[in-house]
Amino acid sequence: NSSAIVFDDLRYSSLIESLRPFSTVLSANPTILTGLNGNVSIPKINPGSTSAFVTEGTAVSQSDPTLESVTLSQKTGGAYVDISRTLMMNTGDSFSVENMVRNDLSRSLATMFDAGSVSGSGAGGNPTGIENVTGVNTSSFTSAGAPSYAEIIAMQGLIESDNVSLDGDTSFYITTPAMNSTLKTTAKNGAGSSFAQEDGFIDGYPVLVSSQVTSNTIILGKFSDFIVGVYGGMEITVDPYSLSTTGTQRIVALASIDFAVRHPVSFCVSV
């Protein structure tokens, strides 16, 4: 029996990476503010001043716009991985193992940020995602898992009725993989017509897909009105000391970010 002298050949260069949700919001052209420190307040006029025509010789009326603010406050998240001495010895290449872990932690942070931007609860240190922003437009579908084309298009009208101008560069639909598949087979005007989602677009607006979106939900928004506040950069620290008595090396990844919207009415979420 020769099995005792057959060794495993570990091919870390051919590592099969974990499957993670697609990143969406950062590809939707949001407004990104970098190098932030502490709480950041962005002044906002809501509602603005109002003008009106008057007859000759009549004084115009006073208008009192309301000044509000949009606030960003640091939300920190991260993870760590412990690499055992045995693993590093068995691979014979601690650098490759460390790089593998660094890359996975980086992807993990990106996934966490995307989840926060879409469905973050705003509680317990979490940022507030689009689905939970107070004041966004909401739309109810007759059949939650199978909206009609008219219902999907009606989301545009809800946003535009609030004086928001949608455009093909910064306005996107975002939905789940399952809903996206449904939209590809949802006829616009009955049998024989074209479909709601064709070639990655709905009525000229790009469609992004993410498993971070809540089941049966469709989001439409002008993402230039979505603000991503970045506090510093992603920090990855190699700590050989905390578990030095066992020869274990700890890799820690941390990053701080927050999200806000200029105008909640720039978004519509199906409920």
Predicted regions and their residues:
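Protruding loop/beta-arch "assembly-hinge" segments enriched in small, turn-prone residues
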Residues: 51, 56-58, 114, 239-271
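C-terminal hydrophobic structural anchor segments
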Residues: 199-240
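Structural recognition of the beta-strand scaffold that forms the well-ordered cores
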Residues: 82, 173-174
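Generic recognition of long tandem-repeat/solenoid scaffolds
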Residues: 41-44, 219-221, 251-253
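Hydrophobic, well-ordered secondary-structure elements that form the walls
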Residues: 176, 207, 251
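Acidic/polar, low-complexity extended loops/arms that serve as protein-protein interfaces
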Residues: 1-168, 184, 195-200, 206-208, ...
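Short intrinsically disordered coil segments
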Residues: 56-61, 96-99, 188-190, 223-224, ...
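A glycine-rich beta-turn/hairpin centered on an aromatic-Pro dipeptide
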Residues: 174-199
